[in-house]
A protein has these predicted regions:
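Interhelical loop/hinge segments that connect adjacent transmembrane helices in multipass membrane
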Residues: 1-11, 116, 180-188, 193-242, ...
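Hydrophobic faces of transmembrane alpha-helices in multi-pass small-molecule transporters and flippases
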Residues: 2-22, 124-128, 154-158, 197, ...
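Transmembrane helix-bundle signature of multi-pass secondary active exporters and lipid flippases
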Residues: 11-63, 232-288, 313-314, 348-355
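Small-residue-rich hydrophobic transmembrane alpha-helices
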Residues: 43-94, 137-145, 264-317, 358-366
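Alpha-helical transmembrane segments of multi-pass membrane transporters/permeases
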Residues: 79, 143-170, 181, 292-307, ...
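Short membrane-interface helical motifs at transmembrane helix boundaries
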Residues: 91-121, 313-343
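Alpha-helical transmembrane segments of multi-pass membrane proteins
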Residues: 113-137, 270, 275, 335-361
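Hydrophobic alpha-helical transmembrane segments
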Residues: 123-125, 155-170, 174-207, 398-424
């Protein structure tokens, strides 16, 4: 497979991620132009942290669906599994947002100041169906990716951004609602619209490749138990990944200048998400295209190119006036918030490149059904992050610098671990990294 073939398969998925990550800055820009912008921005960061934490077990249904949706029986099985998980996560969201459990989590565990916490609850209540909408559309997107319909995934993100952006602008102009209420409503409008589009866009695959009249695919029959054990490590990996955001916000809430740090962190996080989007699109590309040594080498080369490219882009953004223009003019952040955010971005400079490398290794392991190893790597990442935040917080490091340093160190350690494991399990060759002799297990 040529580099251009990989590029054209990957490009719509990258575009989809870019559009999704652009949603956050659009929402933040609207909040920054409404009353009490610092409080509302801090509350929005916590709402999103909790929402994505609750949805985390279902995020990797995209990888599961891409890897396993091979015929009508497996499609039906994964659909049933997805609906079960969606129902469970909706119940959890209701318990957290509508019961006293909210005070325990937000007030006691996260240590969020009361003036911020009072706005977090209604925002989370509005997002009751967030996990269900995400679950349904990611399941269907996995089907589209498996059958080379990645453009439809990108168009779904266009629909989402149009609905969320249109809703936030309309409500900001036509109502006097608080910023967090407008933001949560806009986010829900976007994900529901995208789920609806995915339901419409997947119909050709249901009539052709996944038609009930088609003979079952070759290989062993997938059972609910098999599906559960395949997805469980991926679900745990997503849980661990998304625990990072509440972990960081909790640490920032306990350090000096908590309100400013919590207001700046969503801006830093959103920019880092946008720049890391090329890496987030890689796992499903690797899962779908891994087929033989030649493809593996071409995917490896493509990964290195993407990692180098986005590292350069991050450096240009952070080290030139572009970052100041974006934070102060586009986002209209207060000067003190923009200054903190720029410092945080500077310290996150190594993160995007390492994210791409880790995404490639995860995709390679998932393609060969070593999902537990992916989970182990993320567990290491979370452990290093937690330990680093605790240590740097004890040393009274500035909040965003401590958070950025912890994230960089954690993903670097995870990268080393995954490199070691793919050499063992998949006999990958890294001449520049000879700390272990490869021992194929397949």
């Amino acid at each position: 497979m040529r580099q251009r073939d990989i590029f054209w398969f990957w490009l719509p998925l990258f575009a989809s991620w870019m559009l999704m990550t652009a949603e956050g800055p659009v929402i933040s820009a609207a909040i920054n132009r409404l009353p009490d912008e610092v409080i509302m921005l801090a509350a929005q960061g916590i709402v999103m942290g909790l929402a994505v934490m609750i949805e985390s077990p279902i995020i990797n249904i995209l990888a599961t669906s891409t890897a396993l949706s091979k015929d009508w029986p497996t499609f039906r099985l994964i659909r049933r599994f997805t609906l079960h998980l969606a129902l469970l996560l909706t119940v959890i969201t209701a318990l957290v947002s509508f019961t006293p459990l909210f005070d325990v989590i937000v007030g006691r565990w996260l240590g969020v100041a009361p003036e911020i916490a009072r706005w977090v609850r209604p925002g989370l209540q509005i997002m009751l169906l967030w996990s269900a909408a995400i679950a349904w559309r990611r399941f269907l997107q996995g089907v589209m990716i498996r059958f080379n319909q990645t453009r439809n995934v990108a168009w779904g993100s266009v629909v989402r951004l149009i609905f969320s952006g249109g809703t936030v602008m309309a409500l900001a102009l036509l109502t006097d609602w608080p910023g967090i209420i407008i933001a949560a409503t806009a986010l829900m409008a976007g994900v529901i619209a995208e789920a609806g589009y995915a339901t419409w866009a997947v119909r050709p695959q249901l009539r052709r490749e996944l038609a009930p009249t088609n003979p079952p695919a070759n290989g062993p029959v997938l059972t609910y138990r098999d599906l559960f054990w395949f997805h469980l490590p991926l679900a745990l990996t997503s849980v661990l990944v998304l625990m990072l955001q509440p972990l960081v916000t909790s640490s920032l809430a306990r350090l000096d200048n908590p309100t400013l740090n919590l207001a700046a962190w969503p801006l830093v996080f959103q920019v880092s998400l946008m720049i890391r989007a090329p890496g987030f699109a890689l796992p499903e590309v690797v899962i779908a295209l891994t087929n033989g040594v030649d493809n593996r080498r071409n995917l490896q080369r493509f990964t290195y190119t993407v990692a180098l490219t986005i590292t350069v882009i991050m450096a240009v953004f952070v080290l030139t006036p572009l970052s100041e223009f974006y934070l102060t003019q586009v986002q209209d952040a207060a000067p003190e918030v923009a200054g903190l955010a720029k410092t945080g971005l500077l310290f996150l400079l190594p993160l995007p490149g390492m994210t791409v490398l880790v995404a490639w290794l995860r995709g390679s392991l998932i393609a060969h059904k070593f999902t537990r190893t992916v989970n182990e790597g993320m567990f290491i990442n979370l452990g290093v992050t937690a330990a680093s935040l605790f240590l740097l917080g004890s040393l009274r490091w500035p909040g965003l610098i401590a958070a950025a340093t912890a994230l960089n160190l954690a993903i670097f350690i995870e990268l080393l671990y995954l490199l070691w494991r793919v050499q063992q399990k998949l006999a990958f060759s890294f001449p520049w990294l000879n700390f272990v002799k490869a021992r194929p297990t397949m």
